[in-house]
From Swiss-Prot:
This is Transposon Ty2-OR2 Gag-Pol polyprotein. Mg(2+) 1 binds at D667, D732. Residues 369-381 have a biased composition (Low complexity). Residues 579-636 are annotated as: Integrase-type zinc finger-like. It holds the Pfam family rve.
Amino acid sequence: MESQQLHQNPHCPHGSAYASVTSKEVPSNQDPLAVSASNLPEFDRDSTKVNSQEETTPGTSAVPENHHHVSPQPASVPPPQNGQYQQHGMMTPNKAMASNWAHYQQPSMMTCSHYQTSPAYYQPDPHYPLPQYIPPLSTSSPDPIDSQDQHSEVPQAKTKVRNNVLPPHPHTSEENFSTWVKFYIRFLKNSNLGDIIPNDQGEIKRQMTYEEHAYIYNTFQAFAPFHLLPTWVKQILEINYSDILTVLCKSVSKMQTNNQELKDWIALANLEYNGSTSADTFEITVSTIIQRLKENNINVSDRLACQLILKGLSGDFKYLRNQYRTKTNMKLSQLFAEIQLIYDENKIMNLNKPSQYKQHSEYKNVSRTSPNTTNTKVTTRNYHRTNSSKPRAAKAHNIATSSKFSRVNNDHINESTVSSQYLSDDNELSLGQQQKESKPTRTIDSNDELPDHLLIDSGASQTLVRSAHYLHHATPNSEINIVDAQKQDIPINAIGNLHFNFQNGTKTSIKALHTPNIAYDLLSLSELTNQNITACFTRNTLERSDGTVLAPIVKHGDFYWLSKKYLIPSHISKLTINNVNKSKSVNKYPYPLIHRMLGHANFRSIQKSLKKNAVTYLKESDIEWSNASTYQCPDCLIGKSTKHRHVKGSRLKYQESYEPFQYLHTDIFGPVHHLPKSAPSYFISFTDEKTRFQWVYPLHDRREESILNVFTSILAFIKNQFNARVLVIQMDRGSEYTNKTLHKFFTNRGITACYTTTADSRAHGVAERLNRTLLNDCRTLLHCSGLPNHLWFSAVEFSTIIRNSLVSPKNDKSARQHAGLAGLDITTILPFGQPVIVNNHNPDSKIHPRGIPGYALHPSRNSYGYIIYLPSLKKTVDTTNYVILQNNQTKLDQFDYDTLTFDDDLNRLTAHNQSFIEQNETEQSYDQNTESDHDYQSEIEINSDPLVNDFSSQSLNPLQLDKEPVQKVRAPKEVDADISEYNILPSTIRSRTPHIINKESTEMGGTIESDTTSPRHSSTFTARNQKRPGSPNDMIDLTSQDRVNYGLENIKTTRLGGTEEPYIQRNSDTNIKYRTTNSTPSIDDRSSNSDSTTPIISIETKAACDNTPSIDTDPPEYRSSDHATPNIMPDKSSKNVTADSILDDLPLPDLTHKSPTDTSDVSKDIPHIHSRQTNSSLGGMDDSNVLTTTKSKKRSLEDNETEIEVSRDTWNNKNMRSLEPPRSKKRINLIAAIKGVKSIKPVRTTLRYDEAITYNKDNKEKDRYVEAYHKEISQLLKMNTWDTNKYYDRNDIDPKKVINSMFIFNKKRDGTHKARFVARGDIQHPDTYDSDMQSNTVHHYALMTSLSIALDNDYYITQLDISSAYLYADIKEELYIRPPPHLGLNDKLLRLRKSLYGLKQSGANWYETIKSYLINCCDMQEVRGWSCVFKNSQVTICLFVDDMILFSKDLNANKKIITTLKKQYDTKIINLGEGDNEIQYDILGLEIKYQRSKYMKLGMEKSLTEKLPKLNVPLNPKGKKLRAPGQPGHYIDQDELEIDEDEYKEKVHEMQKLIGLASYVGYKFRFDLLYYINTLAQHILFPSRQVLDMTYELIQFMWDTRDKQLIWHKNKPTKPDNKLVAISDASYGNQPYYKSQIGNIFLLNGKVIGGKSTKASLTCTSTTEAEIHAVSEAIPLLNNLSHLVQELNKKPIIKGLLTDSRSTISIIKSTNEEKFRNRFFGTKAMRLRDEVSGNNLYVYYIETKKNIADVMTKPLPIKTFKLLTNKWIH
């Protein structure tokens, strides 16, 4: 930009504030703020010309260029008078006239310097018009005019006009303000103020000076009259009259994206190129688009641009896709170069055809020279030679080929070494170059390589390739040696041929060597000449001797290259062991077989062991070792996967001085859970320091006696077998080693006990590493064999035998050899899990089969036999009477890592052990007792229980082998650990816990805390075996909104137990309800209302039933009617609070009985009913079920067993299996299934990128998701989510700081499609966030309370949404995000700047950000104890992530908050809430209908109508509606569920969907369904037909009642106080193990705002104790709600608690402490007294018939259910 000068007018000390330069013509598609040249008014060329001829005079001073606009003496800037702008010493019109305003009446140039411009001026009017051109602030203009402009005929004028800025047109209307701002910003940019204009985020590049501030302020006022400004601009200026930059910032953010940007994105996404146009044209087109986007502040990365270009390539350019597919560092320039090369190649081929070459005279005199070959004539064209006659291309500097072998044709390959210099001789030239001076030595850069091309090398005698992809007929190399330029050997992996398919169908083949140790793929020119192919470097082609062009060659850098597209890929599979066996090693054993036989030991250990003869009957030469070092065993990879290597060098140095067996290392591993009682849960290992000999012993427990027995055994073994004495034993500091018993044992025997020091795990490395090794082997062996987990110790023992027999990499001998023992006899070893057939020499019948299928485990310790597992008999035997089962068509395993069959090899190894030996096998058990296996009914098995009488006949059935394929593997069932022995007699007590594996439950998502049971309402379902088994009845306690927003979360199960009596039919004709009583004196049934399945005595008859002495009996003084409703409060205010005032306006059922305050005994004549205690319809088990044992022909399961699946896939895919059973069944036990509900995976409602876009067949939906995707990308870039200026290399960043990312898509409730870019916070490292920070959202009770108060006080309710809320919160930690997968930046990372969705800390960061803004900028305060509830004197705000609900009496107060929020956040008004008619909201999933001063209705009809039919549940199959979700008297069958694996997973997934949706609805507003929902949630892992029917029935009831709403009416205006009431109820002992169900319902001013149903945490011993527990659970939440109500509404509050237990009220009121039966009960009651008296709580009695909390504790009959709910749910 030319330097320009501004002249000062000596007659004008105060010049104008205006400056202007004419803007250049800018295309409209380049800048949304550009001003078209056609819109510029004409200027007076003559006056401009005159002004341009002025010279600097002594009276004027030239102002030097100042790019920073810094004035040495900045002056204050008082604003001028302009309409409504504030006045601060304005100039008068006369002064303005003197200030040269009159000069602006003519289109002449102002002569004053901008540094002398005064900010004080008078607003121009018709007498003082605006100037047409204004001198700029700087002498540099950002927009020079093109010299070829339309005004070029007046060069002088044009030159001068270039120094002027065209002022923006005056602002004329409020609606066009955004358009005018574009011109005004362009005006400021042309005035050299672009770097101080804020962007839409309010960021500026530098601070402005006072003069610049005055310049902007004055020009804005001059062209934008105050009365024409929009309201929001006026509001800003009213606060700060000079804050023009804020106005510009907000204006920029409001501008819509330019249409040209969208067009450029579409053009870039739809690029296509096939070579029809020149490559240069295509490059210019793409570069222009990218440049335009860059001008609009949209940076397109090279990676993204390359991907879009590659997508549109076709024809010969298409192969570039594969070339760039695996590249991460894409460069756009490199891709354009590749396209240009291909375009040039095609162009050359079109010009150079064989018929044309012979016609041109320029090719006729081409010299032909034959190279130094005897067999083949080779012709080359037009290249320069060295002094030798052999033609040479440019040499590759990375290799000098030198051969030391004979070629196939016995021709010796000439040795030649290429110098490291570019040209070693002055006369040596590259082909196709003129002779020049020799070049200096240089190093080849790896960037010189041309990808997917072969370097044509004249110095290489052999062709070398780095990839075997193109190598045909490859054979392993054993003879050829190649050296590089430094005479270093280059290893050659294989020898083969390269097949070329040139143009015109010419095919040829040359020999090539495969090595990955070269920089380029080298194509030997001499190899080409042997095939009559020559290189013409004049025309850059490969030709035949007759001149036919075969292919073009490319000059790139200093070399010539041939494209690999002419190579034919090799489709021959890699060399396999089969191929090697057939061709070279017919009699050798394949390495995978030996690897399996030797316990999956590593390659080095096996090879070294064979060299040292540690394994007999097998030599190293007997095994095929090719590729053994690189062989990957999938079972080893899975079973031995580790995080990192164990600490090396942890052994102390002095330990090496001991002799063999003097220094032992020991450690205990365990426990292994979920095993049968007979299987060991621990093992203790010993390792000798010197020999590294290893022992393992099984343990069932870690008691002192068990450990002592093992130490006694091993010390005796070492003393007798090795004649050695143990001196030192090193152990850790576990209690099993540091106890007095073991210490005394060591002291008596003179053994030093060496313990590790505190936190010194390194000193115990030998034992720790042994345990890790044994467990790795154990997992691998079990996985490979598919055997059940209870055989885990057999795998450990097998591994110990193998490890003692192999040489470790650090030793020269095996442990057995060090110990002086013979090597392992390989003929005695079978692969772990090898299928065998065991001879049954004592069958039950002579016609029964003599063979029993089994699986070999390990050699016996106590005999010469083998330990074999017999699944059909559930036992292991020690026998030699077995034969190996062969199957020549099976695979080794499901990974198919080789396709060999090892039967023949195995037969050769074990040939002399294949015959049966009679009467010599013994049975093996884990306690090492040996017995005979002659009698298979001796019951030495893994899962042993006394068998019924007819078991033997069943086990020896003639069809035993036919039924054998249906394999059942029993795993433990779980029972409650708290059950005492008398509770489960006559079965034995089990202490082990089960483990029900649910793969889906551990993958993602949270957990749901669930403790409920489920009702069943079906008269058609009959209990199996005429009994009513129980089910767990623990209720879900999910009052927090956080727990229910995403369906099922945090399901915690509890134990099942209890007994249940048969159902007593209720007489529906009588109006008298009977309560159950118990003859046991210790149980008080005075207020028992827990069992709706039995007749219940009404409250009037209650006194007559209380004939059982109890500690909870009311004192005599409270048995009269005078004390029926005791008032707990002693203060003066209590005299105005009565039971009627508490019960008034509550939605209780209308009954004709006496008031609850009347306790007159009207039922004293009714006889007392004696009945046994029964459980509710869905809890406990029949007494008959407890007292009887199963008498089945099949062996009964133990109490801690359940049958688990043997996968069919495991049977089908194992190579060494005996039989393939039909489809196996999975047996599920009810108790184990319920207790296995640890964490249920929530149903995924979102879609991945491939599901939503890539493979989405719904084009309309796909388009919507694509649109949402682009919108999300734009938002992320707009919010500066990550640092776009730099990409970080993945290898340079700490992996802990790297967060994975992904796109998720979903459809919102309003039908819009949403895309969200999220971080994988579920795998975020704990060190990258502060675990103390919590992401808070408004509690659902707080929202319901706020809505209730809003109804009673006629509040306006406004709903807001903040877009991309989390992205407004900065992130403090240093974190890096993986870019989205579709960008292809696999090795690059982005530095996060904002709190991306999904991060652990994002929610907490956003909460702190919005909380700070609401407090500091909106004058709000957070309510103590209730997060995300904010209030001030006028407005209450409930915050749920990015949703805000505003409550206020004055709608303008809400609007004021909205205005403040919009200054900082992109705030959308979902529903302003104005008007007096009914307004509908969708607030956090609730569909709310609200009419101020009248009512509020909460429901989910629209959502349920849409979602329920999609659950694939048959709705209304019989066309009639259900009247209740369930009824009492129905029981969940406890019989084990036998189901296919796939069907089981499918049903569990279905249960998750159904219960997840039901749970969401229940905790929103359908509190009447909570008991039923949570009951079924406990049975998700037990999806029997009965459970599914009950679930379908619940969904059906929800469908039939989907239009039901929670109805609230405005409180009566005569009520001056707020009334908060909790209604409590408990069902005594109706839950498993006699636990009680408790429930509470909370009401504010007669409106139900919440409900809770859960199981009592402790077992209650009476109904009163259960009721006390229920009341104690309600009081804390009641107090918290009371505090919230008082904060939100300053009215006085009355707190009441209603219960139908008089004894509970008596205990709360009484001061007598002598009757408390135990300390716990007493402290509970005393605390309850303190809470009631200290919190001004009124406790009153309510009739059971009116107790609406009854629906929270038990299933009710239809009539009772409707009676208790129809007042508040209808």
